[in-house]
């Protein structure tokens, strides 16, 4: 095996660290954190954020997987950039209900490996909680600490009644198992959760975009 091959192959990052995982599938365990961040940006905007502005922002991964898969293949490359932000959520690798179970578990593992790796390098990491169908509850909360802050996304789950029901079922199971102190909520908050005192809504990008467009249109009309 050539030296160049050894240098480029990532061995699923096992060459960097093998964490003593928890649960049936050995999921790396995260340290509990509390996050006071109010301004969140997608990872796709992180590089363009001015260095001096980064401590006022936190990074989420509620975007398409292809935009952050490179974090898994080259985790060390992005450590300096991510270290500049107030908080960084664990990557939201997809857990679609029609994905094979093996892929769902693999994505949960990758999320936790990266989160733990970032914590080991001094980054404040808040856990992104995600689930699939009810049978995923037996492993999708493995590695998540109890009683701390978490972040979830409802984007793409509320228009279809069946998807909305799956989301609510998983959310209630998350509350039961993890007892989060605060839930940073990205996207529309279902009516049944709006009264929860620990729910902290964060407008999804499309909502912010609509506000910006409306503000620009209003400013343009005022100039006329």
Where do the PLM segments sit?
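An active-site-proximal beta-strand-loop segment
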Residues: 68
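Eukaryote-skewed repeat-based solenoidal scaffolds used as protein-protein interaction platforms
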Residues: 47-52, 63, 71-214
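N-terminal accessory interaction module
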Residues: 32-50
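A short, charged/proline- and glycine-enriched loop
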Residues: 54-56
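Compositionally biased, intrinsically disordered low-complexity regions
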Residues: 23-28, 44, 50, 189
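C-terminal accessory extensions appended to soluble enzyme cores
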Residues: 1-33, 197-224
């Amino acid at each position: 095996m050539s030296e160049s091959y050894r240098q480029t192959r990532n061995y699923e990052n096992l060459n960097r660290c093998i964490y003593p995982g928890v649960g049936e599938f050995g999921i790396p365990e995260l340290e509990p954190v509390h996050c006071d961040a109010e301004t969140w940006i997608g990872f796709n905007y992180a590089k363009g954020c001015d260095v001096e502005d980064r401590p006022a922002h936190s990074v989420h991964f509620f975007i398409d997987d292809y935009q952050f898969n490179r974090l898994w293949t080259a985790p060390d490359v992005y450590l300096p950039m991510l270290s500049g932000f107030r908080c960084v959520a664990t990557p939201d690798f997809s857990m679609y209900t029609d994905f094979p179970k093996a892929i769902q578990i693999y994505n949960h593992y990758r999320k936790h490996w990266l989160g733990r790796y970032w914590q080991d390098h001094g980054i404040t990491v808040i856990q992104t909680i995600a689930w699939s169908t009810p049978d995923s509850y037996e492993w999708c909360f493995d590695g998540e600490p109890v009683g701390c802050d978490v972040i979830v996304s409802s984007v793409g789950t509320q228009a279809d009644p069946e998807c909305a029901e799956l989301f609510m079922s998983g959310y209630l199971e998350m509350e039961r198992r993890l007892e989060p102190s605060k839930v940073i909520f990205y996207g529309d908050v279902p009516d049944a959760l709006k009264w929860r005192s620990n729910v902290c809504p964060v407008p999804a990008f499309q909502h912010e975009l609509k506000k910006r467009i409306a503000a620009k249109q209003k400013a343009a009309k005022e100039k006329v």
